[in-house]
A protein has these predicted regions:
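Single conserved hydrophobic/aromatic residue that forms the stacking wall/gate
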Residues: 2-13
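Stable alpha-helical elements in mature extracytoplasmic
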Residues: 17, 43, 47-50, 66-73, ...
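Charged, glycine-interspersed solvent-exposed loop segments at helix/strand-loop junctions
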Residues: 93-173
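C-terminal intrinsically disordered, low-complexity extensions immediately downstream
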Residues: 171-185
Length: 185
């Protein structure tokens, strides 16, 4: 089986790799390995939407960090796993650099955050309300807002399907690929 690899080449290349994987008949499924401290919300959501809309089975495995935009990437797969020591940090959308301090800017950030919470709640078992509660928690992170969940907590909250490692992720992917092959006739 072929693997599609994308090693930090940029979001455009990752989207192109996903499109090629979707079209390539020799690829039966997708294993997504995640370790991210966040990043570009627009690019991350675009990649998450592509993963969620693929016809081929996809399994994600969070190995290290799954911060803000890493959450939609993880839940976009048909099934998600997380190793026990990995973390998922849920916090409000942030920006850096200069921006205009007016109500419209705030509303734009709020809309972007709503897109993230809507996507995550639609592709996992957590409610949008609970996700926002975790996102706006002021008690956990020093001088910050949000929540850090370890692997078992992420499963308990309904963000991720199961605690497991690479062997279990591959086992689940093979199970989904066999199921998909059985329905194609």
């Amino acid at each position: 089986r072929d693997l599609v690899r994308s090693r930090g080449l940029g979001d455009v290349y990752k989207r192109q790799a996903l499109a090629r994987a979707e079209e390539d008949k020799s690829i039966d499924g997708l294993l997504i390995l995640l370790n991210t401290v966040g990043g570009d919300v627009e690019a991350g959501l675009a990649i998450a939407e592509m993963i969620a809309s693929m016809r081929k089975p996809a399994v994600s495995l969070v190995l290290g960090g799954g911060h803000l935009i890493g959450v939609p990437l993880a839940v976009a797969a048909d099934y998600s796993l997380i190793v026990p020591s990995a973390t998922m940090v849920i916090h409000p959308v942030r920006t850096n650099g200069m921006f205009i301090g007016v109500a419209q800017t705030y509303r734009n950030m709020e809309k972007t955050q709503d897109r993230i919470t809507g996507f995550v709640s639609a592709h996992s078992k957590i409610t949008k309300e609970r996700l926002e509660e975790l996102m706006l928690d002021t008690k956990m992170l020093v001088k910050d807002v949000g929540t850090m969940l370890d692997g078992p907590q992420a499963v308990e909250e309904g963000l991720i399907d199961e605690v497991g490692g690479i062997a279990r992720a591959l086992e689940k992917l093979n199970e989904l690929m066999k199921k998909a092959a059985g329905t194609e006739n």
